[in-house]
Swiss-Prot record:
GO terms for molecular function: DNA binding; RNA stem-loop binding; RNA-directed DNA polymerase activity; RNA-DNA hybrid ribonuclease activity; zinc ion binding. The keyword DNA-binding applies. The gene is ERVK-8. This is Endogenous retrovirus group K member 8 Pol protein. The LPQG and YXDD motifs are catalytically important and conserved among many retroviruses. It comes from Homo sapiens (Human). Residues 57-245 form the Reverse transcriptase domain. Residues 811-859 bind DNA.
Amino acid sequence: NKSKKRRNRVSFLGVATIEPPKPIPLTWKTEKLVWVNQWPLPKQKLEALHLLANEQLEKGHIEPSFSPWNSPVFVIQKKSGKWRMLTDLRAVNAVIQPMGPLQPGLPSPAMIPKDWPLIIIDLKDCFFTIPLAEQDCEKFAFTIPAINNKEPATRFQWKVLPQGMLNSPTICQTFVGRALQPVRKKFSDCYIIHYIDDILCAAETKDKLIDCYTFLQAEVASAGLAIASDKIQTSTPFHYLGMQIENRKIKPQKIEIRKDTLKTLNDFQKLLGDINWIQPTLGIPTYAMSNLFSILRGDSDLNSKRILTPEATKEIKLVEEKIQSAQINRIDPLAPLQLLIFATAHSPTGIIIQNTDLVEWSFLPHSTVKTFTLYLDQIATLIGQTRLRIIKLCGNDPDKIVVPLTKEQVRQAFINSGAWQIGLANFVGIIDNHYPKTKIFQFLKLTTWILPKITRREPLENALTVFTDGSSNGKAAYTGPKERVIKTPYQSAQRAELVAVITVLQDFDQPINIISDSAYVVQATRVVETALIKYSMDDQLNQLFNLLQQTVRKRNFPFYITHIRAHTNLPGPLTKANEQADLLVSSALIKAQELHALTHVNAAGLKNKFDVTWKQAKDIVQHCTQCQVLHLPTQEAGVNPRGLCPNALWQMDVTHVPSFGRLSYVHVTVDTYSHFIWATCQTGESTSHVKKHLLSCFAVMGVPEKIKTDNGPGYCSKAFQKFLSQWKISHTTGIPYNSQGQAIVERTNRTLKTQLVKQKEGGDSKECTTPQMQLNLALYTLNFLNIYRNQTTTSAEQHLTGKKNSPHEGKLIWWKDNKNKTWEIGKVITWGRGFACVSPGENQLPVWIPTRHLKFYNEPIRDAKKSTSAETETPQSSTVDSQDEQNGDVRRTDEVAIHQEGRAADLGTTKEADAVSYKISREHKGDTNPREYAACSLDDCINGGKSPYACRSSCS
């Protein structure tokens, strides 16, 4: 074909003519036309634009156009007075698919072998010598307007790579790279660097360099590219990519930083970007530019104002001095590279050397991702980063890495530091700690805080133990050999805790063990000694962390710090001591509650000691189960324990109401004291749904002391336990797969469903259309209207007032102890359906008893001493037990007796109740039955109410 013939055509000189590379087509995100109107231009600029357009037209770079695309065009005047034409291609670039960078970074001139001769060339108008694909030309059309629209506008489109097009640099690199491929292949022993349109050639001898350059000229010309003859460099000093290259040394080109133009964030961002570009050559440590970096903080608007501080001005001056004096060295290609790590302030500094010649500096970024980064981890990160840089520069790992650690410290780092293991992964070279003897590194400001000296990983023996705590009310405290409370301005418990730890480190100039209930503070204190602290926009937090670090580093004695979980109710001295520290920082109300829990002081005493109101003091007493009754009851067989006051014990469960649709999961909570019910309908029964339900309960019922649930996953999750811990609520579960432990809430579920059915089938509440509205109406009825058996008030009244209404409360009874098989005397604390809570006497825990194991004492209530002493008169129940086994009617008679007693008592006539009780007692067989020992209580007893044995013939 024709193209093949052209490729094989031979000129009269005998040199093959190579066809220029084909244009690279662009990929477009959309076929939608892009038209941006041309803005008016002043007459002077319009005339300059016409001249430039005609010039480009003559050179064949543009052509007339009728394209439906348009981009604005404008001109700018250079310092020389010449005009330059530019096209605003932002709208077009937005619909071009990016090609991606081919050279992500500048090549380092330090890799050019030393003493090799060089030639540096610059391609002339490189973009304008590379054609656009024919189908893409119309996308880069522009319009030159006419003044007053007195004539049609002139339209052109680019035929070559336009300045400002998104992919122009990539296409240019590709074209030039293709042109240089034959040169690289033929002169593989030469060192050739190509970046955009700048080309550097180095060879071991001058003759070989000339041969290489001659061949390069021909290849570049055959590709349609032109060399700028006025920019060819053949002698030292060479200038390439901002560097001045000599036979062995490389220096940055002399520049002066204009400080008068530094006014906005964008100005400082550009300045630091330029400094960062030459930092590997300048060798300015990161810590030496901290004030310049701090100017970047704040408003992220590029046009936001910034002020050059005196400290930052000094750092700019340092940069200028380094530009004048800094230098690096070209390498010997036959000698290996080494990496030196110096423990400089703020963060470590890396130096790539060859023998004693400096090749490049390496630094970590000024800002870090973590709040605290250990210095050892920084060293490991810098090693990994610089190893990759060396491999990128020369293709090999460094021959040796020198670190500021002993052999034992290096061994421990491999064992304990994950960052160290990653940074040195697959390294087979030498790890040493002997630095070369040279003066070029002596200016570095070194630090000794590489590994911890004061902070210990294990508890200290024979050291003081101090507990710390902080509260959101701003108080910090510690307790131990002595106690101290510190008032802080912080409204964060963690920050107050941080102040407490700092104070302990300052107050105890001796070895100490610190125990804190803040995991965050503990972790920060453990690592702060050698850590780089990340800057935070919160100035208070910065000050606290810096003060903590300074305090730790100033200490002369070691310390150990560990974490303890708060409010766990675990036994042991650590928990008690931590609670004592908590008490020191609690608010007045919390202190009053904790003091009452400790001493059970009355409301007047609480108000006198703490700054609380009468209502708050009374609420504390009313919510205390010990102060409302004698003691907290213990669980006995066959009984569901109830709360003895509102919010003492809740039961909670999830039931299902299919008619509610996706809200069919109804979460139900019942207060076991008042039987107050609250329920919410939700879409599931996970922990998040349970927490949402409980927050609703808290808003209506208050916060309970204890909650009992089944063993569902929503109730047994760690997230739920954490939620309860935050609210200081204890939690118990029933026996798996046994619903009897949840009998109260199970019965409540049935009651609630029944009420819902009643409302739906026979109610007139047509307004209750949503599931929650139906549920709320049922709850209002059950809580505020219904009065249940053995109650005289509604559940809502009982829950809000805490008032007991059982008619049997305070009465003396006989109760059966199933463990000892004996009948004992007790006093009724509360009485419900099928259960009662009984106090056996002073200093004894109350017990929950089924009503079938209760029998009325039937005598005027005596004082506690006499009631307790009566136990000596109580007969053993072995005969009763044997009768229970032999005669099934006895148990039935007991139950009938209790039922009749309750019924008689409900009538309100004590005489009749006593008479019924005595009559039933005579039906029991044997003299050892407790009924036979019940004293006669008839007003006309001829024996004075003594033993009923003497009354059988007279009083009965």
